Amino acid sequence: MQLLEERILTDGNILGENILKVDNFLTHQVDYRLMKAIGKVFAQKYAEAGITKVVTIEASGIAPAVYAAEAMDVPMIFAKKHKNITMTEGILTAEVYSFTKQVTSTVSIAGKFLSKEDKVLIIDDFLANGQAAKGLIEIIGQAGAQVVGVGIVIEKSFQDGRRLIEDMGIEVTSLARIKNFENGNLNFLEADA
């Protein structure tokens, strides 16, 4: 997605050897116009897939996921990273390790929001090692629902996340694919949409 790649080049900050900071339009402050455009691209890509739910994980996946859900006219569900006292029964959970934060979290979704009839599109802000997507795939599987695809805003293609998901037989659609970070710059691969 050219608009997204241009925004990354303009406003993204490279930290260290493999961290891209995009807090001024995605991970802290949200550019809703860009998120709306991202949502439309995912909706067009999966228009014929019969998506019934969009699922993400809190927090930075929520903005692109809600706009994708709006464009598809389906509900959006986000997995919670912290135990909530109001979620007391029928909870679907998975362990997710965050390489960025160096912690393992138990993420959860109330089972009443997913059923075996659902066709789910997972949306997330980043794909690196694939652990967040893997955890969501596990949760959706516990409900007996079908994961149709995984939509990613920014993929770090030099890490193993895409391979992990595709090895499960699930399609990955990334709107910006980073080949590498080199001398304080980044290089893109061709995006999926």
Swiss-Prot record:
<keyword id="KW-0808">Transferase</keyword>
<keyword id="KW-0660">Purine salvage</keyword>
<dbReference type="GO" id="GO:0000310">
    <property type="term" value="F:xanthine phosphoribosyltransferase activity"/>
</dbReference>
<dbReference type="GO" id="GO:0006166">
    <property type="term" value="P:purine ribonucleoside salvage"/>
</dbReference>
<feature type="binding site">
    <location>
        <position position="156"/>
    </location>
    <ligand>
        <name>xanthine</name>
    </ligand>
</feature>
<dbReference type="InterPro" id="IPR050118">
    <property type="entry name" value="Pur/Pyrimidine_PRTase"/>
</dbReference>
<dbReference type="GO" id="GO:0005737">
    <property type="term" value="C:cytoplasm"/>
</dbReference>
<comment type="similarity">
    <text>Belongs to the purine/pyrimidine phosphoribosyltransferase family. Xpt subfamily.</text>
</comment>
<keyword id="KW-0328">Glycosyltransferase</keyword>
<keyword id="KW-0963">Cytoplasm</keyword>
<dbReference type="InterPro" id="IPR000836">
    <property type="entry name" value="PRibTrfase_dom"/>
</dbReference>
<feature type="binding site">
    <location>
        <position position="27"/>
    </location>
    <ligand>
        <name>xanthine</name>
    </ligand>
</feature>
<dbReference type="GO" id="GO:0032265">
    <property type="term" value="P:XMP salvage"/>
</dbReference>
<dbReference type="GO" id="GO:0046110">
    <property type="term" value="P:xanthine metabolic process"/>
</dbReference>
<dbReference type="InterPro" id="IPR029057">
    <property type="entry name" value="PRTase-like"/>
</dbReference>
<comment type="subunit">
    <text>Homodimer.</text>
</comment>
<feature type="binding site">
    <location>
        <begin position="128"/>
        <end position="132"/>
    </location>
    <ligand>
        <name>5-phospho-alpha-D-ribose 1-diphosphate</name>
    </ligand>
</feature>
<feature type="binding site">
    <location>
        <position position="20"/>
    </location>
    <ligand>
        <name>xanthine</name>
    </ligand>
</feature>
<comment type="pathway">
    <text>Purine metabolism; XMP biosynthesis via salvage pathway; XMP from xanthine: step 1/1.</text>
</comment>
<dbReference type="Pfam" id="PF00156">
    <property type="entry name" value="Pribosyltran"/>
</dbReference>
<comment type="function">
    <text>Converts the preformed base xanthine, a product of nucleic acid breakdown, to xanthosine 5'-monophosphate (XMP), so it can be reused for RNA or DNA synthesis.</text>
</comment>
<protein>
    <recommendedName>
        <fullName>Xanthine phosphoribosyltransferase</fullName>
        <ecNumber>2.4.2.22</ecNumber>
    </recommendedName>
</protein>
<dbReference type="InterPro" id="IPR010079">
    <property type="entry name" value="Xanthine_PRibTrfase"/>
</dbReference>
